[in-house]
């Protein structure tokens, strides 16, 4: 009996559209990116901070778990398909959210996200309980992900600000 390997995608969920990941900086419109990306891994291999990995469908996806984006533009320069926007444009429209797992919300003193945030988009304000609570200023945030990388409980997540 011969097995059709192309049909295995139904069992593994690969038939779904390969989206819901954060694409590399300057990758632009997701539908254009997914249509023209050859999944060659050139951008993944060029990433100096190792935040790019193969995501759904083998497309490059950002993972802020261990590091931040330095906006070095190496991923864009490595792409043989010229899919990336010019460096002088905004890298991406990401919105970071501090979730309920945040240690400060659990009455545990922690300010690692603030300490790692170079543009100082995260500040801690006093509360009646005595534990300072984080506030994220999205106007100051550059989307580097340093806060998410430094969070010991992975309470900080990123998503696109606008439909991508």
From Swiss-Prot:
InterPro entries: 4Fe4S_Fe-S-bd (IPR017896), 4Fe4S_Fe_S_CS (IPR017900), Fe-S_Ferredoxin (IPR050572), NapF (IPR004496)
Chief site of localization: cytoplasm
Residues that, per the record, bind [4Fe-4S] cluster 2: 69, 72, 75, 79
Xref: CDD domains: NapF_like
Domain of life: Bacteria
Disruption outcome: Deletion of the gene does not decrease the rate of electron transfer from physiological substrates to the Nap complex, but it has a significant effect on cell energetics.
Pfam families the UniProt entry points to: Fer4_7, Fer4_9
Binding sites annotated in the UniProt record for [4Fe-4S] cluster 1: 37, 40, 43, 47
Subcellular location: Cytoplasm
Protein name: Ferredoxin-type protein NapF
Source organism of this protein record: Escherichia coli (strain K12)
Encoding gene, per UniProt annotation: napF
């Amino acid at each position: 009996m011969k097995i059709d390997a192309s049909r295995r995608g139904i069992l593994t969920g690969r038939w779904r559209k390969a989206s819901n990941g954060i694409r590399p900086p300057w990758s632009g419109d997701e539908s254009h990116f997914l249509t023209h990306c050859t999944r060659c891994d050139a951008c993944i291999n060029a990433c100096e901070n190792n935040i790019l990995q193969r995501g759904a469908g083998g497309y490059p996806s950002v993972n802020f778990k261990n590091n931040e984006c330095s906006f070095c533009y190496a991923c864009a320069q490595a792409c043989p398909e010229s899919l990336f926007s010019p460096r002088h444009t905004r890298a991406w429209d990401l919105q970071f959210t501090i979730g309920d797992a945040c240690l400060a919300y659990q009455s545990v003193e922690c300010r690692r996200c603030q300490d790692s945030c170079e543009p100082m988009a995260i500040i801690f304000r006093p509360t009646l309980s005595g534990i300072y609570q984080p506030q994220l200023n999205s106007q100051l945030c550059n989307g580097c992900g340093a806060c998410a990388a430094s969070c010991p409980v992975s309470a900080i997540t990123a998503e696109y600000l606008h439909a991508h």
